[in-house]
Amino acid sequence: MSDKLVVWMDCEMTGLRLDSDKLIEVSALVTDSDLNILGDGVDIVIHADDAALAAMPPVVAEMHARSGLTDEVRRSTVTVAEAEQQVLDYIRQYVPTPRTVPLAGNSIATDRAFIARDMPALDAHLHYRMIDVSSIKELCRRWYPRIYFGQPEKGLTHRALADIKESIRELEYYRRTAFVAPPGPSTAEIAAVAAQLGGTAQTAESPQVEGTTQAD
């Protein structure tokens, strides 16, 4: 798996019911390992019929009406298949080889479930590993509450592209506040921690090869 790039995605749906709700907006950005955004990304509003929009739970209907997404969905002529192709075209500019780059975002498993359901070719192009910023948030809530409560406020626009950019900014915040500063601990310090936890540290000279037996 590549350690240089990350694919970021966010989706807006008519709800969270995987058996019935519709995917109505999808956005994607690719970053390098330092979270610099590559290119302009894509942001695509997908058409849904009035029946699907009428079935939205009240809180979702109010959210999408306030953001303007509902009106854009009605005006859109883009199908799910067309949106999938546009996202793939953008991602393949930077990630031509399938299953080499992880998917990132906030609570990204929810987005991934709708992507897998509606956009199987896109799902297959992404590595199965995911980077969930929400997991780091929850760890900071428990281990570093000052970091958790000091995080920058979110815009809460509930539009896909804006949400991705906020997720990238949030991860950069945690990187600067919660993670060990580069280049990280020394080899001896790493070995000591590994020994305390009952394991053996991998050496920098012998990286684990993708597909071997190490648990992941």
UniProtKB/Swiss-Prot annotation:
SUPFAM superfamilies according to UniProt: Ribonuclease H-like
Keywords attached to this entry: Cytoplasm, Exonuclease, Hydrolase, Nuclease
E.C. code: 3.1.15.-
Keyword set includes Coiled coil: no
Chief subcellular location: cytoplasm
Record InterPro entries: Exonuclease_RNaseT/DNA_pol3, Oligoribonuclease, RNaseH-like_sf, RNaseH_sf
Alphabetized GO MF terms: 3'-5'-RNA exonuclease activity; nucleic acid binding
Enzyme class: hydrolase
Example of a GO cellular component annotation carried by this entry: cytoplasm
Residue ranges of domain Exonuclease in the record: 6-171
Active site: Y128
Superkingdom in the source lineage: Bacteria
Coiled coil: none
Pfam families cross-referenced by the UniProt entry: RNase_T
Record's subcellular location: Cytoplasm
Family as reported in the entry's similarity comment: Belongs to the oligoribonuclease family.
Role: 3'-to-5' exoribonuclease specific for small oligoribonucleotides.
Name this polypeptide is given: Oligoribonuclease
